[in-house]
Amino acid sequence: MRMIDIIEKKRDGHTLTTEEINFFIDGYVKGDIPDYQASSLAMAIYFQDMNDDERAALTMAMVNSGDMIDLSDIKGVKVDKHSTGGVGDTTTLVLAPLVAAVDVPVAKMSGRGLGHTGGTIDKLEAIDGFHVEIDEATFVKLVNENKVAVVGQSGNLTPADKKIYALRDVTGTVNSIPLIASSIMSKKIAAGADAIVLDVKTGSGAFMKTLEDAEALAHAMVRIGNNVGRNTMAIISDMNQPLGRAIGNALELQEAIDTLKGQGPKDLTELVLTLGSQMVVLANKAETLEEARALLIEAIDSGAALEKFKTFIKNQGGDETVIDHPERLPQAQYQIEYKAKKSGYVTELVSNDIGVASMMLGAGRLTKEDDIDLAVGIVLNKKIGDKVEEGESLLTIHSNRQDVDDVVKKLDSSITIADHVVSPTLIHKIITE
């Protein structure tokens, strides 16, 4: 088999066999196939696309290129959730203890964040003493006993994906549905998930700007999952504004605690209930989405979800008293109100700009080596559709420096107030095939 034949076959719009895809992935990871041939195939895939069988084969070839996490000692159906990312996306912090409270095992591997705010692990490390460096045996034991644990990423998972991802970045092949879908799904499958729930974001603050593109990606990932024996569902949710009100690590953790108490922002609560219902159904803990939703609401109302979060924090060395004493979380030195320059209705909150403003305060990383300031960030006091009076606070800047002129300048271009009302949609579609 020769790589040039595989490139020409895809260039001419033909279907690659599983053997050909395996040959490419295997050779590329070993270093036998050079970058210039791999980038040539990536471009051919970009223009000619792949069918469902090719996409599934590419995903599994990437899974098999490295280690796979074995979660077979954990009882029950392991359901993992993946979000394509957004600003203020606090869902994992709420979802993990919430679905665990209704007996769904959550064995979460998480990374540190690059970009606007930290990843799930950074947010949890805002809790004094919390750690994710636990060995596999402890991880399995914690999930079996308490239904939820979070561990840092380890092992050599999907090395093929890492290489192809870096290559796509510099060869103009990032926006290819088969390449994005196989990249995301290979990581989830390698991490040991039996079933997968996907939150595909669309809108100005999302990777997929249009609903059409988001749908195409959601269908692609759901089909890959179902084709390789992992029950998969997706929802398409809106990222035309940040989710919830908090952007920043300790601030988002506080918001997660509020949400588990039933006092969280409406949009975050709704998204969590929608995603959580799918997880509960896929874990065979409820027959219908309606029944699953009722179980989750009951877990919040009864305090079971909050109790689960406490035990989870304690199990991983954290100070669980922060649940009842949020003032023990890292606090920024200055709270600066950003006020409306005119009266009207909020019609636009540019997610990415608000995310960047939060990063300028120190809430996120530009490079892997950067330190994060866990206390800083932004809290939105108004969301799209809200009425606002001139001089009223639109958002609060939590900062450890007094001079935030650069941040204010960034925010000036990210908020629009007009004289008409805009009603945002949160959940656009649910995709099951």
Swiss-Prot record:
Reaction(s) the record says it catalyses: uridine + phosphate = alpha-D-ribose 1-phosphate + uracil; thymidine + phosphate = 2-deoxy-alpha-D-ribose 1-phosphate + thymine; 2'-deoxyuridine + phosphate = 2-deoxy-alpha-D-ribose 1-phosphate + uracil
SUPFAM superfamilies reported in the protein's UniProt record: Nucleoside phosphorylase/phosphoribosyltransferase catalytic domain, Nucleoside phosphorylase/phosphoribosyltransferase N-terminal domain, Pyrimidine nucleoside phosphorylase C-terminal domain
Gene Ontology molecular functions: 1,4-alpha-oligoglucan phosphorylase activity; deoxyuridine phosphorylase activity; metal ion binding; thymidine phosphorylase activity; uridine phosphorylase activity
Known EC number: 2.4.2.2
PROSITE patterns reported for this sequence: THYMID_PHOSPHORYLASE
Function comment: Catalyzes phosphorolysis of the pyrimidine nucleosides uridine, thymidine and 2'-deoxyuridine with the formation of the corresponding pyrimidine base and ribose-1-phosphate.
Subunit details: Homodimer.
Family: Belongs to the thymidine/pyrimidine-nucleoside phosphorylase family.
Record's protein name: Pyrimidine-nucleoside phosphorylase
